[in-house]
């Protein structure tokens, strides 16, 4: 009796056309935002480190404004971290909801791999940080700093070095970042919540309930939701829970599955409107007022000698790469999934290294973890910048080694010889596509025959005696 066949499931294979189009559109905006984020970080470092400009940077960052009776007389730096990042986490909430109802996280089998990779990619950096500080006698408060991935910064690196990742690897990186954001949100909510103001928290919950009810009733109009969102955010801030949680909660409430006849779900439409605001304004401004740490030779030396900062660097550079790669490899092994024929395991390790760029959320968690110790906060920020830079350099080297292969795969994914707007690789099972291609090649063949006859005739006339 023949042994039963064991089927192997492919992962990191070709995306469906709708998923490919969604990933391409989402990452296009994130790439532009990532370049702006990179420029904002560089501007912050220059502004904070040029002696003639340093005082103005400190003055602007610590300038307070806002309604004091409402508990919102905040510095510019706090408005950026607590206010603008709420927009970023609102988009993250929509992304997570979409992944859960229509993306890779909808199917438990398909979700197992990116979720396991993301979990390992957070657990191992936290473990690396903890072991480094237990050995060196440092503070364990920053264990969560190296656990985050900054998708926008990673895409900016790809844009700068001119590397074209295949859509499957880009989708894998995007899903990793979405799951990362989810657990970062949970970490912020659970471990960095101050003394609770239950009255404000109750008000925020009631506001969220009203927000949900209006969505379910189909009420439309930004003039309804924007003021309500601001009220919810203000109440959440005063409750003691980090205000960005309000953005996530509202994002998760949006409907991201399409009803019959709908071209876009409401969540997709709102994400399309808000993502440019998040990527192009909110996150770069946060970087501008958070990345401005004073860098000196001594400070850079301390990054590699102080246990807290060394733990952050090792967590981002070593922990992220080993965690994501190890989680992916182990999950594939135990679920009997096989890697796509077009890719190799070094490609997964390169993407895992790229995920070690943990800029935005790592800076935020660093501020929360070491609140009250401005010197250590700045040192940890410098460690985040250093670790992200090292991770980017390692990923750049690894990706460049495979760039020719990636370029060929991207060209295959984008080729559209029949000019119908759909890449040819997605039409191989469509008879109409092959008929169109046959007509195209027949026209080309007829043209070549005509040219051959003309050339042959001219040659025959010139073959006669001089």
Swiss-Prot record:
Its main location: membrane. It is a multi-pass membrane protein. Signal peptide: none annotated. Keywords: Antiport, Cell membrane, Ion transport, Membrane, Sodium, Sodium transport, Transmembrane, Transmembrane helix, Transport. GO terms for molecular function: sodium:proton antiporter activity. One of its GO terms (cellular component) is plasma membrane. Na(+)/H(+) antiporter that extrudes sodium in exchange for external protons. HAMAP family: NhaA. Belongs to the NhaA Na(+)/H(+) (TC 2.A.33) antiporter family. This is Na(+)/H(+) antiporter NhaA. It comes from Streptomyces avermitilis (strain ATCC 31267 / DSM 46492 / JCM 5070 / NBRC 14893 / NCIMB 12804 / NRRL 8165 / MA-4680).
């Amino acid at each position: 009796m023949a042994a039963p066949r064991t089927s192997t499931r492919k992962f990191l294979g070709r995306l469906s056309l709708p998923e490919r189009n969604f990933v391409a559109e989402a990452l296009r905006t994130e790439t532009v935002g990532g370049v702006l984020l990179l420029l904002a970080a560089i501007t912050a470092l220059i502004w904070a480190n040029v002696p003639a400009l340093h005082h103005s940077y400190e003055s602007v960052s610590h300038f307070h404004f806002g309604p004091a009776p409402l508990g919102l007389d905040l510095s510019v730096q706090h408005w950026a971290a607590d206010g603008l990042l709420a927009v970023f986490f609102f988009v993250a909430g929509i992304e997570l909801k979409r992944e859960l109802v229509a993306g890779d996280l909808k199917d438990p089998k398909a979700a197992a791999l990116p979720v396991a990779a993301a979990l390992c990619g957070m657990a191992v950096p936290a473990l690396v940080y903890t072991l480094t500080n237990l050995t060196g006698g440092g503070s364990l408060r920053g264990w969560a700093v190296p656990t985050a991935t900054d998708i926008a910064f990673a895409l900016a690196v790809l844009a700068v070095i001119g590397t074209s990742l295949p859509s499957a690897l880009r989708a894998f990186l995007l899903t990793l970042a979405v799951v990362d954001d989810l657990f970062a949100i949970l970490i912020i909510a659970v471990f960095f919540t101050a003394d609770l103001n239950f009255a404000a928290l109750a008000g925020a919950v009631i506001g969220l309930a009203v927000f949900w009810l209006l969505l379910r009733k189909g009420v439309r109009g930004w003039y309804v939701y924007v003021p309500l969102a601001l009220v919810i955010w203000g109440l959440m801030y005063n409750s003691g829970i980090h205000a960005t949680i309000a953005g996530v909660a509202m994002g998760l409430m949006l409907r991201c599955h399409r009803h019959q006849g709908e071209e876009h779900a409401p969540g997709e439409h709102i994400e399309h409107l808000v993502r440019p605001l998040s990527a192009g304004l909110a996150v770069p401004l946060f970087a501008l007022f958070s990345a401005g740490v004073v860098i000196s030779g001594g400070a850079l030396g301390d990054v590699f000698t102080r246990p807290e900062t060394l733990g952050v660097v090792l967590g981002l550079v070593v922990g992220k790469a080993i965690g994501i790669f190890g989680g992916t490899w182990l999950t594939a092994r135990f679920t009997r999934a096989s890697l796509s024929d077009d890719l190799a395991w070094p490609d997964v390790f390169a993407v895992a290294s790229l995920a070690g760029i943990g800029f935005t959320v790592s800076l935020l968690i660093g501020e929360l973890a070491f609140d009250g110790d401005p010197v250590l906060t700045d040192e940890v920020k410098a460690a985040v910048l250093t670790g992200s830079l090292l991770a980017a350099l390692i990923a750049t080297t690894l990706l460049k080694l495979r760039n020719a292969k990636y370029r060929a795969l991207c060209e295959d994914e984008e080729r559209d010889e029949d000019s119908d707007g759909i890449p040819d690789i997605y039409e191989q099972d469509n008879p109409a596509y092959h008929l169109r291609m046959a007509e195209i090649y027949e026209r080309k063949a007829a043209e070549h025959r005509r040219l051959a006859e003309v050339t042959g005739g001219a040659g025959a006339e010139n073959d006669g005696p001089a």
